[in-house]
Amino acid sequence: MFRRIFLFDEDSLNSSVTSYTNASQSTTTIMDYSLKSSDTQGSSSGIFTDHPGLNPCSERIVELQYDIRLKLGALMPKESAQKVLEASEALHGESNNIAFLEYLLEDLQQNGVGGEAYKDAVDLSKDLVSSPLEQFEIISLIPMKIGNLYFSFTNPSLFMLLTLSLVLLLVYFVTKKGGGNSVPNAWQSLVELIYDFVLNPVNEQIGGLSGNVKQKFSPRISVTFTFSLFCNPQGMIPYSFTVTSHFLITLGLSFSIFIGITIVGFQKNGLHFLSFLLPAGVPLPLAPFLVLLELIPYCFRALSSGIRLFANMMAGHSSVKILSGFAWTMLCMNDLLYFIGDLGPLFIVLALTGLELGVAISQAHVSTILICIYLNDAINLHQSASFFIIEQKRV
């Protein structure tokens, strides 16, 4: 369902006058599904509950514009609903000329894709500037609906499954001979590098535990690191989708990690885990304020981790798309001066692509470091790992 804006005159909105005048003064927002109500179409009482005085002429305009969009959708089965909407709006231009709208609809119905109206819609929609945020659009691949709940299989679900399958296949082929080769090949070296890369922050950032206990956290952290490592640069591949560019996905990932770390803190320290909310020696009157000040930043860890990853991925990929489109536009110009000057934007796009690839990989590393720091805070109640190293040297 799409929210549309149509122009009507003030008289048509406030009365049931059947005469139609030029629309120029006010706007009203409607939902397209309102047009499906057969008992309200063509009646002077109006088809919209927010404007009961909408006259039949204005209703007819809305019906014709809606029918044009439906007909274009039938003629463009491979295009998305958003593309069909853009083509229909470019064709009729939100016109309030009933004769013109009837002509467009009649041409689409009689001539189809060979008609002048369809060709104009396709040509006009090509001239529209595409948004750099279109790459983050969620598309329903397999629609599924149970009651009022939607369980559609979308493109983020597809690429998450592809990422999971790729990681599992990589690990399977490396370990299928019972632990790998004594002389590692390139793929085995990659898996071992990922494992060592995660193990080092675990040993450095988490203190107060033996090495064997620390390594119990390594598989869980490795899964998070590997998922981010493969999902973040995924959007740099043409016609792919950046899973971590959506806030709900990154928030779900960070929130689940936050809950797990909190559970580990309670398992390790019991109710004494809550002592980090109130430092020792604080006067009693200040206790409520300090508890609140400590609790808010602690809870915001889940939110900040999700926002950081989402914002970096969306901003970086959008910048690459904008500059790439700019460079391509200059390259397509026939002027020699533009072609020579286009080398600058091309180099900028190349440098920005490398920078975005580095940011995508570094975000996985940053997430791993933060998880280890949060784990250390939960286990040792905000005592750094260096404190335990100094204590061990003293002993």
From Swiss-Prot:
Main location class: mitochondrion
GO biological process: proton motive force-driven ATP synthesis
An annotated Gene Ontology molecular function: proton transmembrane transporter activity
GO CC term, one of those recorded: proton-transporting ATP synthase complex
Keyword terms: ATP synthesis, CF(0), Hydrogen ion transport, Ion transport, Membrane, Mitochondrion, Mitochondrion inner membrane, Transmembrane, Transmembrane helix, Transport
Membrane-related topology note: Multi-pass membrane protein
UniProt-listed PROSITE patterns: ATPASE_A
Superkingdom of origin: Eukaryota
Transmembrane segments: 153-173, 246-266, 273-293, 313-333, 339-359
Location(s) in or outside the cell: Mitochondrion inner membrane
Coiled coil: none
Complexes and interactors: F-type ATPases have 2 components, CF(1) - the catalytic core - and CF(0) - the membrane proton channel. CF(1) has five subunits: alpha(3), beta(3), gamma(1), delta(1), epsilon(1). CF(0) has three main subunits: a, b and c.
Function, in words: Mitochondrial membrane ATP synthase (F(1)F(0) ATP synthase or Complex V) produces ATP from ADP in the presence of a proton gradient across the membrane which is generated by electron transport complexes of the respiratory chain. F-type ATPases consist of two structural domains, F(1) - containing the extramembraneous catalytic core and F(0) - containing the membrane proton channel, linked together by a central stalk and a peripheral stalk. During catalysis, ATP synthesis in the catalytic domain of F(1) is coupled via a rotary mechanism of the central stalk subunits to proton translocation.
Family designation: Belongs to the ATPase A chain family.
Protein name (database record): ATP synthase subunit a
Species: Nicotiana tabacum (Common tobacco)
